[in-house]
Structures are given as structure tokens and as C-alpha cells.
Swiss-Prot record:
It comes from Bifidobacterium longum (strain NCC 2705). It is found in: Cell membrane. Signal peptide: none annotated. Keywords: Cell membrane, Ion transport, Manganese, Membrane, Transmembrane, Transmembrane helix, Transport. Belongs to the MntP (TC 9.B.29) family. Probably functions as a manganese efflux pump. PANTHER family: MANGANESE EFFLUX PUMP MNTP-RELATED. This is Putative manganese efflux pump MntP. GO terms for molecular function: manganese ion transmembrane transporter activity. InterPro entries: Mntp/YtaF, Put_MntP.
């Protein structure tokens, strides 16, 4: 049980890194972080990070009887792809984001929340094969809460420290997802046991 909780928390932190990085970027452009802006950021990112794994879970559940014999390969491929993409994106410079002023209305937050949650959809697919329904509910709640907290913290960190933490956070999140994907594959192949 402790192992499952640790896995869920690691997944939650990893999935939250995109929203954290975007929030740091938004924090760079504000003179001060208003409470209502932190709440909006928390609700947008946390809410979408909860919604997309649910959608991924239901998509996977619908087709699970067809893919259970190779689900570990799906989990491995998705987590390694998502993690690798996060690491790759960390090394790409996005000059548009650095020049954009932080706005928190729905026209600005909706595309960011969706973009940051695409990975969470794929993680939801993976979670459908990894956990029971009860564990899945805890995972979805954990992903939403952790993402919300990280996005609020990202605003403050971006405001206080600048862009120094944006790239390392995204790289760390990507590496953790890659390692989790490798762990799932090695467990299924009987190389390791947890």
C-alpha cells in the first residue's frame, strides 16, 4: 500500500511539472501575485489535471479487454514518451512565453490548462492498467491537488526568483515519468519486484 501511495505521489508531482513551469513563466511577468490570480491558476490547472486522467481512464477502461496482454508496454511507452517530451521541451526556448504578460482570464487560462493536461490524459490511460478504481480515485485527487498547489507556488517562485527553476522542474518531472515507465516494464517482465 505504501508503495502505491509513493507511486501516486511521484506521478502527481511529475504531471504537475508542466503547470508548475507555466506558472513560473506567468509569475515572471507580474509585479505581485494577487490572491485571486493564484486561486484562478490553482483551479484551472488543478481542475484540468483532474479531468484529463479521468478521460484517459475511461478511454482505457473501454478498451482494456483488448489490451491487457500488452498493457505494460503501453504504460512504458506513454510514460517514457511523456517524460522524454517534457525533458525535450525544457531545452526549447520559448521567447513568446517570456514576453507575454500574465493574464488569468479564461481566454488565456483555458489553452494553457488544456496544453498542460494532455500528458495527464495519457497518464490516465496508464493508471487504468496500474491501479484499482479506489487507487485511481486517490490518484486523480492527488494529481489535482498537487498540480493546484504547484501552480500557485510556481506563480510565487516565478515572481521571486525568475526563470531559474522553470527548466529544472520540467526536467525532473520528465525523468521521474521515464523512471516510472521503466519500473512498470521491469516489474511486469519479472526483472524487479516491488
Amino acid at each position: 500500500m505504501i508503495s502505491i501511495i509513493i507511486q501516486i505521489l511521484l506521478i502527481s508531482v511529475s504531471v504537475a511539472m508542466d503547470a508548475f513551469a507555466v506558472s513560473i513563466g506567468k509569475g515572471l511577468t507580474v509585479s505581485r501575485v494577487r490572491v485571486q490570480d493564484a486561486v484562478k491558476s490553482t483551479l484551472w490547472f488543478g481542475g484540468f489535471q483532474m479531468l484529463f486522467p479521468i478521460l484517459g481512464y475511461f478511454a482505457a477502461s473501454t478498451f482494456s479487454k483488448y489490451v491487457t496482454q500488452f498493457d505494460h508496454w503501453i504504460i512504458f511507452a506513454l510514460l517514457v514518451f511523456i517524460g522524454g517530451n517534457m525533458v525535450h521541451e525544457a531545452f526549447e526556448e520559448d521567447e513568446e512565453n517570456s514576453k507575454e504578460t500574465a493574464q488569468f482570464d479564461w481566454k488565456h487560462m483555458l489553452p494553457l490548462a488544456v496544453a498542460c493536461s494532455i500528458d495527464a490524459f495519457a497518464v490516465g490511460v496508464s493508471l487504468a492498467f496500474m491501479f484499482t478504481k479506489a487507487h485511481m480515485a486517490f490518484a486523480i485527487l492527488s494529481i489535482g491537488v498537487v498540480t493546484g498547489l504547484f501552480s500557485a507556488a510556481g506563480l510565487h517562485i516565478g515572481r521571486a526568483f525568475g526563470s531559474r527553476w522553470q527548466k529544472p522542474a520540467q526536467i525532473a518531472g520528465g525523468v521521474v515519468l521515464i523512471l516510472l515507465g521503466i519500473k512498470v516494464l521491469l516489474e511486469h517482465l519479472g526483472v524487479i519486484a516491488f
